């Protein structure tokens, strides 16, 4: 059977459910697919809880993560939805960016209110740069009808306070309450299917269409450099974001002092291009640049769009022994290599006050100082390597210098 072509007529967004264990994240995912299949039909297919729960394992940057991907659509948009079974899987997924989320649905039980992982997931969402969070207060059916409104109001206040604490707009965040279980059963009272449709409406209206990589400023990590006699120096790599046109000025950033040059030609598969865009593997001919003035690990970028830095705060997940990581903990002043885009740079890790050591399997906030600067922005992902093997994965949470 021929593969169905992906329909691009609707804007596409990546969303994920986050929240404390047993607050109903997977049930909500099942309820969304089931409710939309009934209410809208179209391409929506109901997916049962147990189909989502036995999530296939995938490897992202060498780390095994169990994630379940579902898809559904509203009248306005197509969504890819990721749900992870275990708390550790959420941490790894968010830090490695295995599924980059354009928005997260935070699930909070009406009977418990915010719990430790609720906080941890909100903090992680903030640290790794999830731009929007909306909230579903679940298990409303577990509250006595006469107490329901009052209890939900209290939980809602707590959640808004938490969101504000971690710099999300807690006062304006849409919060919908209902029961994922009731919706799954086809219940048509306000806490059943209508609550799910209300949540979808909040997702459609509160979260704007994301800027896609093509709209962002041009950036290409340099993979290789060679010189063509009589033509000059060519830098090759895959365009990470944006568009590059012939005669555009670019900066060469990272490792050494920043320089400027002009792209006088673009080739792909030995054909000349007028312009290259995100996803293209190209060779860029650089005016007046000598082969020894540019190296793998630098980036070509639109002037002024990104700067080189050495010091940053990071959110890091350290692999367990079983995942191929270290067998022993590391301590302050640990000096591994940090792999950014196309190259390793040595850096020194400083642990937070009161943390003596970091064990395999931990996730930890630490500060890093690299020996040479790398073009970076908040949200940039990296791997931590030692002797050529990956021992951790991280994301730049804050640039300090």
UniProtKB/Swiss-Prot annotation:
Residues 179-181 are annotated as: G5. It holds the Pfam family GTP_EFTU. Keywords: Cytoplasm, Elongation factor, GTP-binding, Hydrolase, Magnesium, Metal-binding, Nucleotide-binding, Protein biosynthesis. Residues 10-211 form the tr-type G domain. GO terms for biological process: symbiont-mediated activation of host plasminogen; symbiont-mediated suppression of host complement activation by activation of host proteases. Its EC number is 3.6.5.3. It catalyses: GTP + H2O = GDP + phosphate + H(+). CDD domains: EF_Tu, EFTU_II, EFTU_III. Residues 19-26 are annotated as: G1. InterPro entries: EF-Tu_GTP-bd, EF-Tu_GTPase, EFTu-like_2, EFTU_2, G_TR_CS, P-loop_NTPase, Small_GTP-bd, T_Tr_GTP-bd_dom. Signal peptide: none annotated. It comes from the Bacteria. One of its GO terms (molecular function) is translation elongation factor activity. GTP binds at residues 19-26, 83-87, 138-141. Monomer. GTP hydrolase that promotes the GTP-dependent binding of aminoacyl-tRNA to the A-site of ribosomes during protein biosynthesis. Belongs to the TRAFAC class translation factor GTPase superfamily. Classic translation factor GTPase family. EF-Tu/EF-1A subfamily. This is Elongation factor Tu. The gene is tuf.
């Amino acid at each position: 059977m021929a593969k169905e072509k992906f329909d691009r007529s609707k804007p596409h967004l990546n969303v994920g459910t986050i929240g404390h264990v047993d607050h109903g994240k997977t049930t909500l995912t099942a309820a969304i697919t089931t409710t939309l299949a009934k209410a809208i039909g179209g391409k929506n297919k109901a997916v049962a809880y147990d189909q989502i729960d036995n999530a296939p394992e995938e490897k992202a940057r060498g780390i095994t993560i169990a994630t379940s991907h579902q898809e559904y659509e509203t009248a306005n948009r197509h969504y890819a939805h990721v749900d992870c079974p275990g708390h550790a899987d959420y941490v790894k997924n968010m830090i490695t960016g295995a599924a980059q989320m354009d928005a997260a649905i935070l699930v909070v039980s009406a009977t418990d209110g915010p719990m430790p992982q609720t906080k941890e997931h909100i903090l992680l969402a903030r640290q790794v740069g999830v731009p929007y969070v909306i909230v579903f207060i679940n298990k409303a059916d577990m509250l006595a009808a006469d107490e329901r409104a009052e209890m939900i109001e209290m939980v809602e206040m707590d959640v808004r306070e938490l969101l504000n604490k971690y710099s999300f707009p807690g006062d304006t965040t849409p919060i919908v309450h209902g029961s994922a279980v009731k919706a799954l059963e086809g219940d048509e009272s306000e806490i059943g299917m209508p609550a799910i449709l209300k949540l979808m409406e909040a997702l459609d209206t509160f979260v704007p269409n994301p800027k896609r990589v093509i709209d962002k400023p041009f950036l290409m990590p340099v993979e290789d450099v060679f010189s063509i006699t009589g033509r000059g120096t060519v830098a090759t790599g895959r365009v990470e974001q944006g568009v590059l046109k012939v005669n555009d000025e670019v900066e060469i950033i990272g490792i050494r002092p920043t320089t400027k040059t002009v792209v006088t030609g673009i080739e792909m598969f030995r054909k000349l291009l007028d312009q290259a865009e995100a996803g293209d593997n190209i060779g860029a001919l650089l005016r007046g640049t000598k082969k020894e003035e540019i190296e793998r690990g630098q980036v070509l970028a639109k002037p002024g769009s990104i700067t080189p830095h050495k010091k940053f705060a990071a959110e890091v997940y350290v692999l367990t022994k079983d995942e191929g990581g270290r067998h022993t903990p590391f301590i302050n002043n640990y000096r591994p290599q940090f792999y950014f885009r196309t190259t390793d740079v040595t850096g020194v890790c400083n642990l937070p006050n009161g943390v003596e050591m970091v064990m395999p399997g931990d996730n930890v906030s630490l500060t890093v100082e690299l020996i040479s600067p790398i073009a970076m922005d908040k949200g940039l992902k990296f791997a931590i390597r030692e002797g050529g093997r990956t021992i951790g994965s991280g994301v730049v949470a804050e640039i300090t210098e």
